[in-house]
Amino acid sequence: MSQTSPLSEQADSSLKYDYSNVPAQALDAIRMRLAQLTHSLSKIRDDMSKADLPQWYSLQAQLSVTLTQLSSLTSTLQHFEDTLECTVPYPLPSFPTTAHEGLLTTLMRKKQIPEVENWIKDAIDHSGLDLEGRNWDEIESAIQRDKSTTARALDFINQEYSNYSFQGLYTAEELSKNVGDPQSMIYRSATSNAKPKAPFSVDSILTFMYQGTMKTEETSIAK
C-alpha cells in the first residue's frame, strides 16, 4: 500500500484555501431540493413496484407533492442561474479520488449525459427555434414572448374556470341570475338558496313507532 510522504502531508497542511467565493448558499439550497425530490421519486417507484398498488388518492397525493418539489427545484435553479453558470468545480489535493472517483468524474464532466442531451434536443425541436440562424438576443426575446403567451393563456383558463360551477349544466353567471330550477339536483350549485328539510324529531319517530301516525305541525295545531 502506498503511503503519503511526510513532506506532502506538511505541504497540504500548510496550504490555506479561500472558501469565501464558494456559493455555499446556492449549492446547499439545490442539494436540499434535489434530496427531497429524489426521496419522493424513490418512494413512488417503490410503491409502484409492489404487488399491491397503492390507493389512487395516496398516489395522487404523492404526485402532487412531487410536482410541488419539482417546481421548487426549478425556481431555485432559475434563482441561482447566474451563480451556477460562472461556477467552476475543481478538486482540492485532499479530495479522496480513489473512494469518490465516480463523483469526481461527474463534477469534472463537461458534456451532458445522453439522457440530458435527448431532453435538450427534444425541447429545442418542439420550440421551433433556429439556434444556428439567430443570435442570443433573438432567442431570449422569443422565449420571453412564449412565456408571455403562456401567462395570458393561463389567466384566460382561470377566468373561464371561475365562470362555471362544475356542479351542473348552468354557468355561475346564470345561477346568480336564478336561471333554471335550483331545486333540481342536476342544476343545484353550491350557491343555491334551496334549504334542506328539517329532520324528524325524536317525538315524531316514537309516535310513529307506537301509534302508526306521523306527528306533523298541522295535526299538532289542530289539536
From Swiss-Prot:
GO annotation (BP), single: positive regulation of transcription elongation by RNA polymerase II
Listed transmembrane segments: none
Any single Pfam family the record assigns to this protein: Med8
GO MF: RNA polymerase II cis-regulatory region sequence-specific DNA binding; TBP-class protein binding; transcription coregulator activity; transcription corepressor activity
Location, primary (coarse class): nucleus
UniProtKB keywords: Activator, Nucleus, Transcription, Transcription regulation
GO cellular component: core mediator complex; mediator complex
Entry's localization field: Nucleus
Xref: InterPro entries: Mediatior_Med8_fun/met
UniProt function note: Component of the Mediator complex, a coactivator involved in the regulated transcription of nearly all RNA polymerase II-dependent genes. Mediator functions as a bridge to convey information from gene-specific regulatory proteins to the basal RNA polymerase II transcription machinery. Mediator is recruited to promoters by direct interactions with regulatory proteins and serves as a scaffold for the assembly of a functional preinitiation complex with RNA polymerase II and the general transcription factors.
Family stated for the protein in its record: Belongs to the Mediator complex subunit 8 family.
Subunit structure: Component of the Mediator complex.
Name assigned to this protein: Mediator of RNA polymerase II transcription subunit 8
Protein species of origin: Eremothecium gossypii (strain ATCC 10895 / CBS 109.51 / FGSC 9923 / NRRL Y-1056)
Lineage: Eukaryota, Fungi, Dikarya, Ascomycota, Saccharomycotina
Gene (UniProt): MED8
